C-alpha cells in the first residue's frame, strides 16, 4: 500500500494500462476484461486487474498532468513492481499529418514543465519511450489494420492559455499533437528502469478547430483500447 494506491502487493500484473480519467479505466474493465476486480480506489482514482483473452492485465488512472501521472507511475513501479506501462489518452492535434480519430504513438515528448530539468540537473532530457514496446505497438497496429501515426508530442502543464503561437514551430520539429503526461511518464520510467509508451487518440484538432462528438470519441477510443490490450498481452 502507498499513500495513493491501496491495492495489496501482488494485485497488479507486470503490464498496466494507464488512463487519465478513472471512469475510463472502469469502462475498459467492464467492457473488455474478464474477471475484472477493482483493486484500488484512493481519491476515487480507480485501478483494476483482470484478464484479456486469458492473459493478465491491470488498469490504473493517473489524473491530469505530469505531476499527478508521475506520482502513480512511481508507486506502480517501485511498490507494485509494474514493468510495462502504456498510457492511452486523448490529444489535440496540431499537425496537418494527422486528423480526427487518428492514433498517435509518441516517439518523443517535449514539454514546458520544469520537472524533467529538475530531475536531470537542469540539462535537457530526451524523454523517449521503450523501443520494444514501441515496436510491439507498431507491429500490432499493422496486424489490426490501424494506420498508426508516429511522431513527437508536446506535454504541456497548461490546458488553457497555451502558447498557440508556438504551434508552427512545434510542427516544424515534427510534433503531431499536444497532451499533458507523456514527458513525465517517459522520464519516470527511464529513471526507474521500467518500460513505457504513450498512445493518444486525436479527439480534436487545434488548428482546424474540428472536434469529435461524444459518441465518436468513445468509438475512436475503443479502437485504441483494443490495440493496447492486444499488444500488452502478447
Curated annotation (Swiss-Prot):
The record marks 217 as: Important for catalytic activity. A purine D-ribonucleoside binds at residues 4, 179-181, 203-204. It catalyses: a purine D-ribonucleoside + phosphate = a purine nucleobase + alpha-D-ribose 1-phosphate; a purine 2'-deoxy-D-ribonucleoside + phosphate = a purine nucleobase + 2-deoxy-alpha-D-ribose 1-phosphate. GO terms for biological process: purine nucleoside catabolic process. The keyword Transferase applies. It comes from the Bacteria. Disulfide bonds: none annotated. The active site is at 204 (proton donor). Keywords: Glycosyltransferase, Transferase. GO terms for cellular component: cytosol. It is an enzyme of class 2 (transferase). SUPFAM superfamilies: Purine and uridine phosphorylases. Phosphate binds at residues 20, 24, 43, 87-90. It holds the Pfam family PNP_UDP_1. GO terms for molecular function: purine-nucleoside phosphorylase activity. Its EC number is 2.4.2.1. NCBIfam families: deoD, PRK05819.1. Homohexamer; trimer of homodimers. Belongs to the PNP/UDP phosphorylase family. Catalyzes the reversible phosphorolytic breakdown of the N-glycosidic bond in the beta-(deoxy)ribonucleoside molecules, with the formation of the corresponding free purine bases and pentose-1-phosphate. This is Purine nucleoside phosphorylase DeoD-type. It comes from Helicobacter pylori (strain Shi470). The gene is deoD.
